[in-house]
Amino acid sequence: MGPEEKTIMTERSAAVFIQAWWRGMLVRRTLLHAALRAWIIQCWWRQVLEKLLAKRRRMVLEFYVQQEWAAVRLQSWVRMWCVRQRYCRLLNAVRIIQVYWRWHSCHSRVFIEGHYELKENQLNIQLEISLGLQACKVQQCIPLPLKE
C-alpha cells in the first residue's frame, strides 16, 4: 500500500465517520421531536383529565347540596306540620273550654271576660270574672311542654 492508497482510505474513513455522525444527528433530532410531541400530547391529555375530574367534583358537590337542601326542606315541613297539629289541638281545647265557661257563666249569671294569646311555647290567659259586686282578675302565663 502506497501513500495514495492511505490517503484514499483516510478520506474514505473520514467520509464514513462524517456520514455516521450526520445520520446519528438526524436520528437524535427525530427522536427529540418525537419525544417533544409525545410530551405535548401527554400535557394536553392531563389537562383534559383534570377538566373532567373538576366537572365530576362539581357535579357531586351540586348533587350533595341539592340533597342537603331537600332534607332541610323536608325537616322544616315536618316541624311545621307538628307545630300546626299542636296549635290546632290547643285551639280546639281552648274552644271547648270557652264553650263550657260561657255555658257556666250564662247559667250562674256570672260575667266572664278575657282573652288568650298563644305564642311559641306559652299560653297567656287574662280573665276578668264578675259576680255581682265582686270582681276577680286573673292573668297567667302557662308554659307548654314541647316534644322534640
Curated annotation (Swiss-Prot):
Sorted alphabetically, the keyword list is:
Repeat
Signal peptide per UniProt: none
Q: Give one GO term, molecular function aspect.
A: calmodulin binding
Q: Which residue numbers delimit the IQ domain?
A: 11-40, 67-96
Q: Name one Pfam family in it.
A: IQ
**Please, which domain of life does this record's source organism belong to?**
Eukaryota
This chain belongs to the protein called: IQ domain-containing protein F5
